[in-house]
Amino acid sequence: MNNIIETNKLCKTFSNGGVQVHVLKNIDLEIREGDFTIIMGASGAGKSTLLYALSGMDKPTLGEVKFAGVDITKMNTDELALFRRDNCGFVFQQVYLVDSMSVLDNVLAAGLLTNKDKKAVTEKAKEILASVDITKELWDKFPTQISGGEAQRVGIARALINSPKLVFADEPTGALNSHTGKDVLDALTKFNEAGQSIVMVTHDITSARRGNRILYVKDGEIAGECDLGQYVAGDQDRHRRLKDFLGEMGW
C-alpha cells in the first residue's frame, strides 16, 4: 500500500506572551492510501494542529510534509489553496453551509470549482447526496431547514464532490448527539470502504473504532500507534484492543 502523506521532522511552534510553545515536535509519520487513520490524544496535545499541518491549512515551523510526493511546505499561499482544492476534502465539527443556497447548490458550487460541466457535476452531486442519505426531498431546502446531522452529511458530500485524494475530518461528530453522530460516521465509513482515504481527529472512542489505524498524540509527539485492521468492524476484540491501547497511552 502506497503512502499518500509522509512527514519528516515536522515541528510547529507558537509564541505565547513571548514564550515559545512547541506544539509539534519532530514528527515523522506516514499516512497510507485507503486507510481510515484516527488521530487521538488529550485536549491540547496537538491533534488538530497536526491535522492542519498535514493538510496544508497551517504551515509547520520546520520539517516537510510530502503529499502524494509533493512537499507542500514549499508552496506559497496561492499554490496551497489550489492544491487543497484539487486534492483535499474537509469536514469540520461546525459545518459551514451557505444559508442562501439550497442543499444541492451548496454541493454543486464546490464541484464547479474544478469542473465546469454543470450537468455532469449536478448528477454527481445528486449521487453523492443520495449516498449519504440526503434524500431528494431535501435537495431544494436551505441549510436552516435541515437538522445538524443532515447538514454535516451535506458537508461530507461537499467534501467528496471533487474526488479528493484524502479527506480530513476534525471532530465531525463533536456537536451531534449519538444518533446523528452515528449517521455521520456511517457515511464516512461507507466511503472509506469504497477506497477513500480519511484522516480524522476525535476524542471519542466510539468514533475511533471506525478507523483501522490509530495514532496517539501526546505532548506534541506520536506516542503510540495501534493497528485495528486485523479485527472485523464492530467486533468486541476490536473494541477491547483499542481500549487496551488507550490505557497504555494513559488516555
Residue ranges and their predicted role:
Residues E221-L246:
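Conserved beta-strand-loop-alpha-helix hinge in the C-terminal portion
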Residues S55:
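Helix-to-loop junction immediately C-terminal to a conserved catalytic motif
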Residues V70-D71, L108, K119-E137:
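Conserved ABC ATPase "signature" region
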